[in-house]
Curated annotation (Swiss-Prot):
It is a multi-pass membrane protein. GO terms for cellular component: ERMES complex; SAM complex. Keywords: Membrane, Mitochondrion, Mitochondrion outer membrane, Transmembrane, Transmembrane beta strand. Pfam families: MDM10. The keyword Ubl conjugation does not apply. Component of the ER-mitochondria encounter structure (ERMES) or MDM complex, composed of mmm1, mdm10, mdm12 and mdm34. Associates with the mitochondrial outer membrane sorting assembly machinery SAM(core) complex. This is Mitochondrial distribution and morphology protein 10. InterPro entries: Mdm10 (IPR027539).
């Protein structure tokens, strides 16, 4: 499950119209979400809140023999109040990554939003995608104290700058300076292709990542006005070099994904990937399929041409909807509205009601609208299963219990025919709306 700060960062990317699927780092994101899902390592409690449309806080406390915690702060120049921030209202699919439908590439454009209620004031508007900025810092409290900071800025509608800093405090009796590292990343996304340039102060590492989408250019007005794509084929590569340690790394990959569109010949959406690391001789293929809106499967096969070692992993996710009778609108007065409706319309039969047809029509439309929203935002839970070639099984259940988001992880690792290791881990998340 994503942390609250990660969810806010995804909301920032969505608010600024940044396509995170158009990146080589997201080439195998669908298979990784279904097969390499993260699990809680200990009993951990998260308390988070979007205090203002521009400011968010998060506190974490964990304990299993050793008490630790962290404090996080986030500031965004783009208002994020349009995104739900309470744990009872955030769609669980936003927090628990699963099968991810690859978005079709679009040409980045600059958009304007209203930042206050004065429509006639020119200063009431700001430009999204040009000067949008995000600051994020997390301080891990127990020794050794570690500070993680992130600076994100949209230089232009097609370029984004990211600076990540990690600093660790040294031993108490040591007088040496804290260990720190900086990772700078410049992304250039045109829709047709995406280039990322990286530099890390660790061993002076330089890197490049690129992704190319086959097909029409989304920047072309003629291509953008044509029929939507039914599939997408992308090719990418990455390369790294460190002059200090003489480290060289490279990889390349392909991705084919079908769109979830209404076509005369409808098929299940699926994603195929092929990645190759020439220096190490590693070859990996993945196949992910969404059999229904609530069921998805994925498999991965890896092979090394040098050592002849192989790996095979399979997994699936199953979503379960738990419908609630009433949905809280978040303003605390839904009970009053329900009482008024029951007093005005005590009889369900239309012939026994004294209301006019227009009133009945308006009420029915309002009820259908609320019912549709309730189905989209109703309480959900998901069960993820992963098994490898050694029959090591991992189960993860994520769901809601009242206002809490709960994760329960079950791990069974087989060491021999007679011995196995079983672990049960738990994490609780609670988001406030102050």
């Amino acid at each position: 499950m994503l942390d609250f700060m990660d969810y806010i960062q995804l909301a920032f990317a969505e608010a600024t119209n940044w396509n995170r699927d158009n990146s080589y780092s997201s080439l195998t994101a669908t298979a990784q979400s279904l097969l390499d899902f993260s699990t809680p390592e200990r009993l951990r409690v998260h308390l988070s809140s979007l205090s203002t449309p521009h400011f968010a806080t998060s506190y974490t406390l964990g304990t299993v023999g050793l008490i630790d915690g962290s404090v996080s702060y986030l500031f965004s120049t783009v208002p994020l109040d349009k995104f739900p921030s309470r744990s009872a209202l955030i769609p669980l699919r936003k927090l628990s990554p699963g099968y991810r439908q690859v978005q079709a590439p679009i040409a980045p454009i600059a958009e304007t939003i209203l930042i206050n209620d004065d429509l006639n004031d020119a200063s009431a508007y700001t430009t999204i995608g040009k000067k949008a900025t995000l600051f994020h810092a997390t301080l891990h409290l127990p020794p050794p104290t570690t500070l993680n900071a992130l600076f994100l800025r949209r230089i232009s509608p097609t370029m984004q700058l990211s600076l990540a800093v990690c600093s660790t405090r040294g031993p108490p009796l040591s007088k040496s300076a804290p260990q720190a590292s900086l990772l700078a990343q410049l992304s250039h996304n045109t829709g047709k292709y995406n280039n990322e340039y990286l530099f890390s102060t660790d061993n002076a590492l330089f890197g490049w990542r690129g992704l190319w989408n086959f097909g029409p250019d989304p920047r072309d007005p003629v291509a953008s006005g044509s029929s939507p794509r039914l599939s997408l084929l992308s090719a990418g590569a990455e390369a790294y070099y460190s002059p200090v340690s003489s480290l060289i790394g490279m990889s390349t990959g392909l991705r084919f994904s079908t769109a979830n569109a209404n076509t005369p010949i409808s098929t299940f959406p699926y994603t195929l990937t092929l990645t190759l690391t020439p220096l190490t001789g590693s070859l990996s293929t993945t196949y992910s399929l969404r059999a229904s809106p609530n069921l998805a499967f994925s498999s991965r096969f890896g092979f090394n041409v040098y050592s002849w070692e192989s790996e095979m992993v399979a997994g699936c996710e199953l979503w379960r909807k738990s419908k609630s009778r009433y949905r809280d609108d978040g303003d605390g007065v839904e009970w009053a509205r329900r009482k008024i409706r029951e007093s005005l319309f005590p009889h369900p039969h239309p012939h026994l009601s004294t209301s006019t047809p227009n009133d009945i029509k308006d009420l029915a439309g309002h009820a259908l609208e609320k019912s549709g929203k309730g189905e989209e935002e109703e309480n959900e839970s998901v069960l993820k299963i992963r098994v490898d070639q050694s029959w090591n099984v991992r189960l993860l259940w994520e769901g809601r219990v009242k206002e809490l988001l709960v994760l329960i992880d079950r791990v069974v690792e087989v060491y021999s025919n007679e011995r196995c290791l079983r672990e049960l881990r738990l994490m609780v998340v609670f988001n406030l709306d102050l």
